[in-house]
Amino acid sequence: MQKHENAITFSPDADNDKGQKEKRSMKITKWYHVAEFILVPTLVFGLTGVPEPPRKDAAQQGIKEWFLENYYGRAPIGRPSDMEFKGNEIWIGGGKVKLRLDVALPPGVSKERPCPVVLVADRRACFPTPIKPEKLKKVLAVQDEFRRMATERGYALVMWNVNDAAPDCWLYDRYIKMKPEKLPPNAWGVFGLYGGEPDGRKGDTWGTIRAWAWGHSRVMDWIESRPELDAKRVAVCGHSRLGKVALVTGVTDERFLVAYSNDSGVGGAHPHRLWKPGVCKLSFVNKYHLHWLCLNSRKFEADERNMPHDMDEFLALMAPRYLYVASASKDVWAGPEGEQFAAEMASRAWERMNLKGWGYRGHVGGHVRPGEHDFTPYDFKLFLDFCATPFGTTTTCADALRLHD
């Protein structure tokens, strides 16, 4: 496994007294080059006028509703009455939509000793998808490593291909240009069952990111049906666009204990008001990935920095559960500075609940890996280390293996 000795982690081991908080904030301020980067001065630590994070009350619920109405869209249905579990498959609409699960279990797991679960969304290699052979080989190797890493610690790893729920990228773009009679069976997935395909889409109709998050919730339904899996200790994680999905899943479904976004960028952890040159913009997302968000999001394209609510507030909706935000130092498009800054700003929601927020042993964690936009075993290792606290487990795989002796 590749090591990154210079990775930037935000993991203070000592208690957070006032002096340590000041020292930590100064360090982060220096790393972010606040004078050059922050476009809204009231966001800088130590200045007056920093808005208080919402409490877990009607105000916070109002922020959640705003994002569903104006950004991600609303799911038209919860758990379908006709949903069936057939082994490791979830059948919806009489089998018109099938979510196929790749499940890896740790040794010694049983209904008497259920294990925590890490749920990973994929869109490339869980099952055959159009991907170049050399890239597919790399992706499969990384997934094998993820399985090993999770199961060695005593966690189950569940993966599924989000294209089973709704089409993405080239599929969506190709389908939208085809005549209806030439589309493959159920080409639109859950959109075809419950609405959301391009024709007749309303302003707050769910986009693909919300639909994939809905799929995660259906996988959680399946997890709850399995006695060998502990549905109270489930983490959802994803990379890039699927990192956005992990955050939406955690906010919209409180059964998930942990949400982890890796390089999620705009539409995920990166705040719109902290845009700087080189970082993706909302207008780009809606031009080239028109299906990700709901149509109402387009009204903010011309002035996204002045949206009524932003992603640090969205991240705060995970409180009082657990949040982990990972970035890559050279992933300019995702904006690692903004991602990490939003996570620390969101942390104040936990602190208002008298819970430890930002920090490795707190409820909010994160790291910045040196390198490009990627989801590596190193990222996954740091996240599994973080999960030791919410899962109530040991940190090292060696200690976890001893539990099975």
Where are these predicted regions, by residue range?
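Cap/lid segment of the alpha/beta-hydrolase catalytic domain
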Residues: 121-218, 222-225, 268-274
